[in-house]
Amino acid sequence: MKKIGMIGVGNMGGAILRGMIASGYVAAEDVMACLHSEEKRQALAAEIPGLTCTTDAKALAQECRMIVLAVKPQVLGELLDSIKGEINDRALVSIAAGWTMDMLTSKVAGTTATLLRVMPNTPALVGAGMTAICRQATLSAADLAYAQGIFDAIGETAVIDEKLFDGFIAVSGSSPAYIFMLIEAMADAAVREGIRRPDAVKMAAQAVLGSAKMVLETGKHPGQLKDEVCSPAGTTIEAVAMLEKRGFRAAVQDAMAVCAEKSRQMSK
């Protein structure tokens, strides 16, 4: 029996698959992937030696102990119906947005499958993701730890209560879009000052990357790090004062609030 099965190898599924193999967390020989076309199956098998590839989801469910469901939300229900007879004693890991634990539990009712709901974000595509994990109460500690290791291979993970998922989506799932807007705005301003566009984008992106790294590695409060950049009567405090005047903090918090509320509505 294979250790891990992956149904769906699109952008996110592919990042998870390649990340866990490239990191050495699991050997390609211990993984099976299911793709929707023979052409894609052949291409992936050629790309990753030792990986077993199929177009038959039922066959994968029969062969794999833990199954990552990386298909689009609108087809997950049909997929679960099709493999329901094969998932007894399997641990299912869903990354489908909007599918709550109650919805997943209802779909696998009558089986002994156990469940995890997982929410990665797009920086996982470059190995710098942040993934939230919610476990079903009946899931074993060993299965939780093993699943967490899969997503640790593409960034960082946090095991949280499902009631916090809407907040997680606001602060991490959707937030790359806010940060991209910030980088774009910073680059535009730099171009106005005469800096070439490619250089401006690189400078802005590196500033965000370096600042995030300082928060994570120094352990200092972001406010303290901000204060350390602001010299008395200097350039930075002028910029900070303008951001405060324009309601920068409130805009970010309001954006996150509507994001979380939209997530709650979508899960009903």
Residue ranges and their predicted role:
Residues 4, 116, 165-170, 222-227:
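Short pre-catalytic strand/loop immediately N-terminal to key active-site residues, enriched for Gly-Thr
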Residues 31, 41, 60, 196-203, ...:
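Small-residue helix-packing motif on alpha-helices
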Residues 32, 38, 48, 56-133, ...:
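Rossmann-like NAD(P)(H) cofactor-binding subdomain of soluble oxidoreductases
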Residues 52-57, 158-160:
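Short acidic-hydrophobic, aromatic-tinged amphipathic segments that line or gate anion-handling sites
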Residues 103, 107-114, 130-167, 180-217:
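Internal alpha-helical scaffold of NAD(P)-dependent oxidoreductase catalytic cores
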